[in-house]
Each structure stands twice: as structure tokens, then as C-alpha cells.
Swiss-Prot record:
GO biological process: protein complex oligomerization; protein folding
Protein name (database record): Chaperone protein TorD
Keyword Chaperone among UniProt keywords: yes
Function of the molecule: Involved in the biogenesis of TorA. Acts on TorA before the insertion of the molybdenum cofactor and, as a result, probably favors a conformation of the apoenzyme that is competent for acquiring the cofactor.
SUPFAM superfamilies: TorD-like
Gene Ontology CC: one annotated term: cytoplasm
Protein keywords: Chaperone, Cytoplasm
Protein's gene: torD
Cellular localization per UniProt: Cytoplasm
Pfam families to which the protein is assigned, alphabetical: Nitrate_red_del
Similarity field: Belongs to the TorD/DmsD family. TorD subfamily.
The organism's place on the tree of life at top rank: Bacteria
Length: 236
């Protein structure tokens, strides 16, 4: 291999790793409540360098800066508990102000991945109440498909993350894996089929119900990042 091609290969590898880091970062924010350890990581010199690099893209800067502002204020047990309550109210309980983080509640496998009737209202490692119909979609066909994807890639959901495979945190973590193991076409096909088909609706619901706004900015950043990344994959 020539010196030039070696450099090109290294650049591609570094680019893939950088994209995977972003997906894992977003996955971690949807997987569980923000902890003091995560705040410490993101407000450290290395964490700030990462966030500043993300903010260099004009379409991401507003959301990144708002998240950073919120992180700085998470400097007490009380502030973390308040944010944890927001997370719980949005993603862990059923209710008028909750938002489903599961792809299967937005998409229908029978309709070829097209959006179905909408609800109004870090996850993998290597090796009003919803109706009965909506509850049945949990651990449904999209969960089964994601589980098969994970198994085929020798991945599994963390034992301390008791959620279906079509949870947004699992999907984002799986895309991080694809970033470093698969070609652009496979990545793009997966993103367009399993995330972009419902992410806009999810983001709108979070913006409607998250009065604390931290997860509004996280959802906005996720949606804008996916748009940036899919454009990148199309041009690759």
C-alpha cells in the first residue's frame, strides 16, 4: 500500500470513529438519566473539545450550545434530580405528556416501515395510558428485527438496560457500530429505514412535552445530526 493510500485509509478510519462517537454520545443521553459522572465528562476539557467540534457545524451549533449551557447548571444533586424527573416523565411512564422512544410505536412493519398512527404523546455492548394495541407493539416485530441485527453482529443489549431493541438509544448505538464496520450504503439504508422515518415526529413530541427543554435540545441535535450525516453518506 502506498504512503498516500495509507494516509487516506487512516483518515477514513478516523472519520468513521468520530461519527461513531457522536452516535454513542446521543445514545447515552436517551438511554438513562444524566449522571454526575456524565456531566463531569462533558464539562471536562476533553468533553468541551468534543462539543465545540460538533458546534462548528452551523446546523448543530444552537442545540450544542444550549445543551452545554444546561450542563453547566447541573452542578447540584437537586438539579440532577430535576432533570431525572424530566427524563422519567418523558420516556419511562405512560401519560399525556410522555413521549415514546420506541420505533415500533411510530412505524408499522406490515406497511414496509412507513409511519403508522402516531402516539400523541447506551444501550448495547459486544459479545393517558397507551392502548392494548400500542402496548402490544412493545417487544414487537421491530424489536425482533433489531434483536436479530444485534445478534448477527455479535452485539447484545446491556443487562442493565431492560428496554426493547427498537428503543432510540439502541438504534443510535447500533448505527455507531455500523459506522466502523459497514459501508456508506448499508449505513444509509439502515438510517433511512429505521430512524429517519419517525425521528421528526419523535422530535416534535419531545419539543411539545419537555418543559425543562434539555431533552428538546438533545432531540433537536439528534435530528439535525442525522440530516447532516445522511448528506455526508450520500456524498461519500
Amino acid at each position: 500500500m502506498s504512503h498516500v493510500s495509507q494516509e487516506t485509509a487512516q483518515e477514513i478510519s478516523e472519520e468513521r470513529e468520530a461519527r461513531a462517537i457522536v452516535y454513542n454520545f446521543l445514545s447515552s443521553l436517551f438511554a438513562k438519566e444524566v449522571t454526575s459522572d456524565l456531566v463531569a465528562q462533558l464539562t471536562s476539557a476533553q468533553g468541551q473539545s468534543f462539543l465545540k467540534s460538533l458546534a462548528l457545524d452551523p446546523s448543530l451549533s444552537a442545540s450544542v450550545n444550549e445543551i452545554n449551557t444546561k450542563l453547566v447548571k447541573l452542578n447540584s444533586k437537586e438539579s440532577l434530580l430535576e432533570l431525572a424527573a424530566d427524563f422519567c416523565g418523558l420516556f419511562l411512564v405512560d401519560g399525556r405528556t410522555s413521549v415514546s422512544p420506541y420505533a415500533g410505536q411510530y412505524l408499522s412493519v406490515e406497511q414496509g416501515g412507513e409511519p403508522s398512527e402516531k402516539l400523541s404523546n447506551a444501550a448495547i455492548n459486544e459479545s393517558g395510558s397507551k392502548s392494548k394495541k400500542n402496548k402490544a407493539q412493545l417487544f414487537g416485530e421491530l424489536h425482533q428485527q433489531m434483536t436479530e441485527f444485534l445478534t448477527d453482529n455479535k452485539l447484545q443489549i446491556h443487562s442493565d438496560f431492560p428496554e426493547p431493541g427498537d428503543h432510540i438509544a439502541v438504534i443510535l448505538a447500533y448505527i455507531a457500530h455500523l459506522c466502523v464496520t459497514s459501508g456508506s450504503e448499508q449505513q444509509l439504508n439502515f438510517i433511512n429505514s429505521y430512524l429517519m422515518t419517525w425521528l421528526s415526529d419523535f422530535t416534535q413530541q419531545v419539543n411539545k412535552h419537555d418543559h425543562g427543554q434539555f431533552y428538546c435540545f438533545v432531540a433537536d441535535l439528534t435530528f439535525e445530526w442525522l440530516k447532516v450525516d445522511t448528506e455526508f453518506l450520500l456524498s461519500d
